[in-house]
Amino acid sequence: MAILSTVPALLFALASWAPTVAAQSAADYFVHELPGAPKEPFIKMHAGHVEVTPEHNGNIFFWHFQNQHIANKQRTVIWLNGGPGCSSEDGALMEIGPYRVKDPDHLEYNNGSWNEFANLLFVDNPVGTGFSFVDTNSYLHELPEMADQFVQFLEKWFAMFPEYEHDDLYISGESYAGQHIPYIAKHILERNKKPGVKTPWQLKGLLMGNAWISPKEQYDAYLKYAYEKKLIEKGSPIALQLEQQWRICRTSLAVTNTVDFTECESVLQKLLEQTAKVNAKGERECINMYDIRLRDTFPSCGMNWPPDLVNLTPYLRKAEVVSALHIKPQKTTGWTECNGAVGSAFRAPNSVPSRDYLPDLLKEVPIVLFSGAEDLICNYMGTEAMIGDMEWNGGKGFELTPGNWAPRRDWTVEGQPAGFWQEARNLTYILFYNSSHMVPFDYARRSRDMLDRFMNVDISSVGGTPTDSRLDGEQGPATSVGDIGKNGTSADAETQKKLDEAKWKAYYRSGEIVLVIVIIAAGAWGWYVWRERRKRRGYSGIMGNTPPIAQRGTTRGLEGFRDRRTGRDVETGDFDESELDDLHVTTPTVEMDKDRYSVGGDSDDEPHDEKPSRSNGGRSGR
């Protein structure tokens, strides 16, 4: 009877497993229609959750946009926003994605989208960010565990979308993603070198914008940038206060080599506070830390920026959008730009700054660091100081030979000064003139020109009009900012054929797995029915007085669901009830918590006001 008693459990496990396995195919993630999006051009999308830590209900959300054209090879760009804890839907709908939010109900096409020649994969990272979710007692704390989990996500994602696994892979992002990206790249390279890895991922480059990489230089740059931009005057009472706070910060920096220093964060906070003024309306306003040309109400100081944010949040909370993006019901709170609880947990006290890994990464992977000149919080002076102090590939900084530095090449796009490029030994630095913390928000087409140059895009097989992009007056490679020729989408039929073959192989594999499950379940059920009939005919086993199987198995299953509720995230509060609704058993009813949370409602992690916040436990969201 021991074997017999396991049959219901086996059947239940198989029944539970079958939908899970069946969902692990690209078809289930296909976005059939995105509410409010323009009909043309057609953009193929997939979106949804990938479970990474079942024991903690950890699910990472992704949103994938297929490229519009294939130029000489297949490429995929992964995009991450910063925070930590800020959603990559910022990048998808306010920066490099194919759409921008026009109003709370409508999107419009972004003519500078990065998906012209590259597939785009936006990921809400780490768990708990954006549409991703996890139990609140399981937020991540360190950079290595984040990178491990991200590689797990990619393993599962490529298993579902094998047609992209051989693409040239690029990882890009901004702000605190300057910590995430080098760690992820390091873990990918280590993964590729492990014995038994069937498909090494073709990591071809990293792009980081206004990136928080080296705390030492970046914290030091707050005051230097404020002086350079005349936000404060040297020797003034405000300057003397800030200099005193900087000395406290510098003492802390000398003691430990970590990422986050409260004493140093205070330098920026005091700068914003001391420079705040009362405007003509009698309102106290301060410098926008993400774009010093702008002002914001105090103490937001940039948290309400960019202006698209006022439409982005209600759009992503619309029930039809949530449904279209396949958001799991376990994600019961509405989308928020930045999750303060995630940011507060992710202090990385035992992680070294990602700057420490750049020299080794540059031995294997080209890197682009780009900066908007008007950003304060992750300003270009800190990035330039870090580069100047760093040694890699046989040299220090951009020095080519003693006393001879790599030139800064003037960059113009469509006849307008765009910035400058500087490069040496696998590292490229680009300064964008008149640009904020979110460079692609200001200059989407210019940022895509940067990407296409970095990826060595060759549009000769595509057709269309190349952009007039020049370095020191030289035209350079032919990249495009739009106006693609009519033959663009069919330029590489052979490549598309290979993609389709890989996709259908994945579908067949999923179908085979489900078929095996059905066969096993049918066999187990048949055996179980045969045993029950023999019992009714008078057959008795050794354990004749054992309680009925259904009674024993069901009680244990309900207790299991109840146990999983303990310490659960409010975001996953409905999970147990929705699972139990599908259990058609005749047992005493268990009283469950009746609170319900709407996906379209306010997040428990955000303040209940009209404006979204990037606040991360006292830190400014990067």
Swiss-Prot record:
Top-level taxon in the UniProt lineage: Eukaryota
Segments of skewed composition (Basic and acidic residues): 559-571
Main location: Golgi
One GO cellular component, as annotated: membrane
Membrane topology: Single-pass type I membrane protein
Transmembrane segments: 510-530
InterPro entries from the UniProt entry: AB_hydrolase_fold, Peptidase_S10, Ser_caboxypep_ser_AS
Membrane-side (Cytoplasmic) residue stretches: 531-622
Active-site annotation: S175, D375, H437
GO BP terms in the entry: apoptotic process; proteolysis
Pfam families: Peptidase_S10 (PF00450)
Positions in the Lumenal compartment: 24-509
Molecular function GO terms recorded: serine-type carboxypeptidase activity
SUPFAM superfamilies: alpha/beta-Hydrolases
EC numbers, comma separated: 3.4.16.6
Keyword terms: Apoptosis, Carboxypeptidase, Glycoprotein, Golgi apparatus, Hydrolase, Membrane, Protease, Signal, Transmembrane, Transmembrane helix
Compartments where found: Golgi apparatus, trans-Golgi network membrane
UniProt catalytic activity: Preferential release of a C-terminal arginine or lysine residue
Sites where a glycan is attached: N111, N426, N434, N487
Protein family according to the UniProt entry: Belongs to the peptidase S10 family.
Protein name (database record): Pheromone-processing carboxypeptidase KEX1
Lineage: Eukaryota, Fungi, Dikarya, Ascomycota, Pezizomycotina
Gene giving rise to this polypeptide: KEX1
